[in-house]
Each structure stands twice: as C-alpha cells, then as structure tokens.
C-alpha cells in the first residue's frame, strides 16, 4: 500500500512508444507521413520474425499508428539507428537516446510525489555489457515497439500523452490544491519543456491517434461521441500476463484532458 505505482513502478510502454519512434524518425529525416511500409503479419530479420496482427497493407504513418503496425515501426527504428551519417549502430542508438530523454523518459520528471523513479532507457554501454560489444540493430529491435529494455513509469507515459496533445512540450507534473490567478504561481510551474522534435511532426501522429479511435484501429473502444478522442493502445510481453497500456487525450484540437492506463 506504500508503493505508489504511478511514479515508482517501471513498465515497458509497449506500442504507445511507437508514437515517439515515429516522431524521432521524422525529425531525423528517415520518415515522412506518406511513406508506406508493407506488413505480412510481422517484420522479418536475422531469421526471426517480430509478429504483427492482421491488417491492411501497406500503410502510411497515420494508418500505421491507428492500426499499431509492428512491422512499420521496426523498419522505421532500423532506418533511424542505421543511418549512415552516424557511422555505426552504436552512435545511432546514442542519438536516439538523446531524443528519448527529451520526452522525459530515463530520468525523473521532478514531481512533488515522493520516491519518483526514472524508468530506463537502454544505452550503447548497456548493450556492450550485455553482448560483450558484439551487437547490431537486431539486438535492440524490441525497443522499436516499446519492449526489451525500455521501462517507464505510468506518470512518464501520461506525460507523453500531454506532450503529443501540446504538439511538442510539457510542464513538470505537480499536485495542485487550488490556484488563485497566474501571478500567484511560481514561474517554475508553467515553464515549458520542449522535446527535440519540431511541432509540425506531431500533426500526422495526432491524426493517426484520432483515426485509431474514430475511424478504424486498435483504439476503437475508446470512442466517445462528441469528444474527438485521440488514443493509442499498447501491449507488452511480461513473465506473467501481458501488460496492457493506453494513452489518450481529448479533444483533438485544443485538448483539455489526457489520461494513461496500465493493466
């Protein structure tokens, strides 16, 4: 009862993390909203397959978000970390680390809640230790869909919903009892923290989240008439039953509320 899971527990974000992967890839120039990738029930690499569910193919970014296509985001992640401009996969992962940190992952957000955890974002040094320095993109591919070594607190994942709703920035989460005018608020409480991704790249991601709820996709059960909900589902493997995650905000334009659930 003393363990506050919202800030202390660490869970793989699952497919909700695909939103971050798409944003980073667009900023790095290896993905555009209209690029289409084929999916034949999964992504094949090194004699293995990262499975996916049955859906239409090929998909552009918006539909890949709506349908939560594993193959699409595996390819996007590979293209990002193997970009020749980095010189090596190790350096590609290092650049990826910096982007992910800018979304508030892998570090404490600085809330008022006691015992806040930092979660985990795997680094090249982590993989060097795990694989004795011998690893490639296939070794880290599970991170493309928010599994593997990725670990986030529920608050960090809720913060991701706020970042996307705001098209690229967040405020440090705080507990508030009452507010009496902006002048009474400490300036720290309305300081914006921007990600490394330009706001224009959030547009197709938001559209994909909206389609997934309101048109066709894995988030259809979150539909609420008149609310224009945007959402993204996630499932992550676990030693026991799978973890299920869901993040959302509403309405699509000028959002007023976001939420995150972990089951």
Which positions does each model-derived feature cover?
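Beta-lactam-recognizing serine transpeptidase/beta-lactamase-like catalytic domain environment
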Residues: 1-15, 20-258
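Conserved small/polar residues in nucleotide/adenosyl-binding loops
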Residues: 262
């Amino acid at each position: 009862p003393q363990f506050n899971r919202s800030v202390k527990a660490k869970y793989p974000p699952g497919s909700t993390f695909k939103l971050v992967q798409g944003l980073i890839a667009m900023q790095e120039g290896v993905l555009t909203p209209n690029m289409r990738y084929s999916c034949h029930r999964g992504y094949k690499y090194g004699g293995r397959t990262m499975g996916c569910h049955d859906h239409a193919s090929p998909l552009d970014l918006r539909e890949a978000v709506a349908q939560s296509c594993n193959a699409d985001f595996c390819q996007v992640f590979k293209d990002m970390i193997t970009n020749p401009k980095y010189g090596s996969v190790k350096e590609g992962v290092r650049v990826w680390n910096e982007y992910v940190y800018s979304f508030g992952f892998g570090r404490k957000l600085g809330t008022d809640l006691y015992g806040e955890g930092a979660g985990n974002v795997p680094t090249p040094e982590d993989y060097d230790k795990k694989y004795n320095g011998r690893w490639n993109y296939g070794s880290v591919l599970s991170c493309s869909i928010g599994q593997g070594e990725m670990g986030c607190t529920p608050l960090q994942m809720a913060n991701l919903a706020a970042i996307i709703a705001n098209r690229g920035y967040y405020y440090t989460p705080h507990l508030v009892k009452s507010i009496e005018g902006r002048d009474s608020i400490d300036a720290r409480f309305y300081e914006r923290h921007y990600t490394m991704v330009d706001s224009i790249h959030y547009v197709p991601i938001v559209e994909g989240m909206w389609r997934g709820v309101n048109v066709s996709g894995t988030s259809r059960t979150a539909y609420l008439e008149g609310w224009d909900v945007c959402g993204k589902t996630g499932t992550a493997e676990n030693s026991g039953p799978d973890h299920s995650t869901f993040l959302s905000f509403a309405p699509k334009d000028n959002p007023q509320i976001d939420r995150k659930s972990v089951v």
